[in-house]
């Protein structure tokens, strides 16, 4: 279960000003295991900032996120590696999450090695399964992100996030541009 407690975040209006604008006003919510939730709002309403705070990528000004009762922020908090195993985010700009010098296969295999310590042959087999799930040809295994289209890079980011077998998967408009059958297939996984 993920609990958002009085979470808020603001950003500076510029390098030469002390003025700040509020990206996320204090918000509290509970997301139970097994549920599917949507955070909707207008452009600029703070959806991405909220998602990044839940994922542990953006420190809030106030409040906290609890994963199974353990804080994400503060002195007594969940270990970063454990957090990233439990919560994965696929961001709007998926290409920024990919190492430009790492092949697609190695990128997808990295969570399998880091979190599950799988043998190389087992990792490669699981990687190929995830690539098939995300409609990526197996011969993309040895390609670099720069050799793929934006949509293909997004599918690699999804396969990589699924490789961690997270309890919570956050899509920040990550399936935009995908056809309905592929969206459904990814959401079911």
Per-range role (PLM):
Residues 158:
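Hydrophobic anchor residue at the start of the ABC signature
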Residues 165:
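Conserved catalytic motifs of ABC-family nucleotide-binding domains
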């Amino acid at each position: 279960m993920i609990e958002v407690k009085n979470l808020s975040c603001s950003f500076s209006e510029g390098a030469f000003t002390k003025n700040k604008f509020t990206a996320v006003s204090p918000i509290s919510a509970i997301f139970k295991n097994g549920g599917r939730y949507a955070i909707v709002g207008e452009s600029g309403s703070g959806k991405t900032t909220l998602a990044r705070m839940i994922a542990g990528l953006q420190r809030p000004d106030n409040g906290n996120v609890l994963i199974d009762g353990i804080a994400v922020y503060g002195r007594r908090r969940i270990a970063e590696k454990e957090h990233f195993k439990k919560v994965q985010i696929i961001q709007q700009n998926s290409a920024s999450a990919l190492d430009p010098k790492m092949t697609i296969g190695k990128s997808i295999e990295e969570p399998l090695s880091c979190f599950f310590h799988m043998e190389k042959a087992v990792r490669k087999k699981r990687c190929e399964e995830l690539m098939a799930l995300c409609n990526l040809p197996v011969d993309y295994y040895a390609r670099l992100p720069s050799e793929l289209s934006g949509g293909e890079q997004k599918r690699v980011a999804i396969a990589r996030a699924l490789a961690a077998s997270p309890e919570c998967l956050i899509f920040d408009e990550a399936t935009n541009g995908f056809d309905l059958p592929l969206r459904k297939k990814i959401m079911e996984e």
